[in-house]
Amino acid sequence: RAWMEGTIRLFDANDRALVKARVEALAEGIATGFDGYAEVAWTTGPPAVANTERWNDLARKTAAQEGFAVVDAVPWMAGEDFAYYQELMESCFAFIGTGPAPENHHPKFTVDPAAIPMAARYLVRMAEEALRQIQ
């Protein structure tokens, strides 16, 4: 008996379908080679977050105008419900940091209350700039 578990994230829906089919075919082929069988249980989560350059640039520009330190994030394929919106329209998923603290899913995560008005101003500016650009 063998067990394999993992996460696969791809930006393209066609690529996701292809990878799923290939994983199933590989599992069946390997199992057959050892006179066994394979069962593949596939749980589909949200697609990978994929920011578009246009909105990413606007988010960075607006953050700089608000006096925020703009940090280049390590490329990362976040699995986030926001990605479903991104399948419908161009957008940008941005992080707003509040200083050194445990990450957002950590039980000791807290938000610095002083950061809330600054984040709200940033989001309002982003909305205003986005509306100007799409009109």
Question: Which stretches of residues belong to each language-model region?
Answer:
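Metal-dependent amide/peptide-bond hydrolase catalytic core
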Residues: R1-Q135
